[in-house]
């Protein structure tokens, strides 16, 4: 068993023996992952502690530019953060808390604004009252506060409605600006409104035109909102709100990953 395999399996005693025989503490696999990265990813707390004590570099990056903390948090074995990974995260240097500004606006999804119950201009007015952009901001704020591990502070949020104009300047003392374009849609199918909501997210450093992240969330009517249907206009708001909440987690982790890589 080599040191990489031992780290992955959490075999601390074998690692001690291998290091005594001159094994490389910073050996890497094909993806550039060191023993510390693998032990962190697989939640091997005792092994992580041993490797850190022996001087393993926690800030080393693999070929995808991920480090041990990112692997333990964002790509743990098993697909979700286990309690073992919490113990691992405490042993590794914590990243700085990122300061994020959000600007959001909404626009009707081009092809899909045909409600069974309202004409397009009525639907536009209805959406102005629902505030889909504000819903997405609120869902993201809530997720950051309750499930985001305090790694992102949302220091400013500007919901601009269906205009691009804002009286409020974006603060300069932030790590990044997240721009959200929310595209609510409705299609009349068999006397019910089939709803959709696409969220286009772009993340930029202040004064930098090259995005750290450009990604869509909640795509398509067929996949989007899992075929959520409204039998009257009063159901639009609650259904859009539920959908915004379901996208907050994927959006938050994508933003955090981009910031940690950036």
For every predicted segment, state its role.
Residues 124-126, 206-261:
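Short secondary-structure boundary motifs at beta->alpha junctions and helix caps
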Residues 159-214, 222-225:
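Surface-exposed short loop/turn segments
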Residues 79-82, 87-150, 159, 254-262:
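A structural "domain/chain start" motif
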